[in-house]
Amino acid sequence: MPPAEKSEGPPVPAPAERARGRVPGLPSPALCCACGLCALLAGVNVTLAGAFASFLPEHNALLVVGLALLVLALGFFAACCVCSRRGLAPRGRSAAAAGPGQGGGRAGPVALEMESSEPTAQDTTAVQLSPAVSAASSGCSSPGPSPLALEAPAPAAVCALRSEGVQLNPPRARAAP
């Protein structure tokens, strides 16, 4: 029999550990919210159809059914709130006491990182919020004490009235100090 191979890397938590945050008997809050949205949409549609049919509720079944669907949607949204609140209670420690990287509150300073694609006249920029002292933080985009200070961009194109056409002056990357 061949020896068992040890895997390199972090251990994968068991399914029971992953689902520890939710009570097993309650449905998913996302499911309750989705059902509530469907019932709300149906209730609004049926209520509007009934409201324009006639204004006597006893002879207008659409108005009664539409209002019942709206009450059902309110019940689903209430269940969504209950399921999401009850799922947080049985944890061993609170979210504020969790360590860094575990979803804890007040983890420290946050840096605003901006990454841009190749310098072209039509440029796109991605903005990412990450902790200032994380592995994802490059340190290049926030060298100073004010990580949220943004610099004004250099002009991307200058129009010269010559026969050659347009002269492009793309922004240059700064040399690291």
Curated annotation (Swiss-Prot):
Entry keyword tRNA-binding: no
Positions of the UniProt region annotated as Disordered: 1-20
The entry's keywords: Membrane, Transmembrane, Transmembrane helix
Predominant localisation class: membrane
Gene Ontology annotations for the cellular component aspect, listed alphabetically: membrane
TM regions (residue ranges): 36-56, 62-82
Membrane topology label: Multi-pass membrane protein
Protein's cellular compartments: Membrane
Superkingdom in the source lineage: Eukaryota
Protein name per Swiss-Prot or TrEMBL: Transmembrane protein 275
Organism: Homo sapiens
Gene: TMEM275
